[in-house]
C-alpha cells in the first residue's frame, strides 16, 4: 500500500515478478526514492530495471519527506542516467515556469505528471503548452480534458495503460505533456 514496498525491495521484486508472470498488460509504476533515505533509490531502481515497465513515474522525494522540502533533482538525474525504462517526472510543478526550469535543467524530459499544481491551477496544462490567456469554451476545455485522459499526443504518462479488451485503466491524477 502506498510506499510500503519501498522499505522492502525484495518484496517489491517478488510482487513485480508475479505481476509480469501473469499477464501481458502494460504496467507503469509511480515511485518515490525510498521509504526513509534517498540512498535507497539505487537498489529500488535496480528492481524496476529488471522489468519492462511502460513508464517509471518518479517523485524524487522519500515517503518520509511526504511533500515537504525540495525535490531531489540529483536523484532524478541519476534515474535519467540509469533507468532502463521510459521516465516521467512528478513533483513540484506548480506553474508553467516550474516546468520550463525542469526542461532547461533536464533537456529531453518530455512527460511530467501534474498533481497538486493542476488542482490549484486548472489552467496549468494550457499555460505549459503556451496557450495561457486563451479563452476556451466549455466544449474546447472538455476536448482538452478528453485528450489528456485518453493519452493522445504520445507517451504513456498522459493517460493510462490499456487493460484487457481495450479497457482504459487510469493510474494518475492528471498529466500534461510538455
What kind of feature is each model-predicted range?
Residues 1-178:
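Flavin-dependent oxidoreductase catalytic cores
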Amino acid at each position: 500500500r502506498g510506499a510500503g514496498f519501498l522499505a522492502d525491495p525484495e518484496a517489491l521484486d517478488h510482487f513485480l515478478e508475479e505481476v509480469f508472470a501473469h499477464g501481458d498488460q502494460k504496467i507503469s509504476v509511480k515511485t518515490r526514492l525510498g521509504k526513509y533515505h534517498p540512498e535507497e533509490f539505487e537498489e529500488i531502481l535496480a528492481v524496476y530495471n529488471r522489468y519492462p515497465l511502460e513508464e517509471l513515474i518518479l517523485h524524487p522525494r522519500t515517503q518520509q519527506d511526504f511533500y515537504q522540502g525540495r525535490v531531489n533533482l540529483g536523484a532524478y538525474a541519476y534515474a535519467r542516467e540509469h533507468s532502463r525504462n521510459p521516465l516521467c517526472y512528478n513533483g513540484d510543478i506548480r506553474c508553467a515556469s516550474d516546468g520550463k526550469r525542469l526542461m532547461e535543467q533536464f533537456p529531453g524530459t518530455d512527460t511530467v505528471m501534474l498533481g497538486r499544481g493542476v488542482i490549484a491551477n486548472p489552467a496549468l496544462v494550457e499555460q505549459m503548452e503556451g496557450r495561457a490567456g486563451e479563452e476556451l469554451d466549455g466544449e474546447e476545455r472538455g476536448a482538452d480534458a478528453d485528450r489528456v485522459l485518453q493519452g493522445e499526443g504520445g507517451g504513456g504518462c498522459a493517460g493510462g495503460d490499456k487493460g484487457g479488451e481495450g479497457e482504459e485503466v487510469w493510474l494518475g491524477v492528471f498529466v500534461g505533456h510538455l
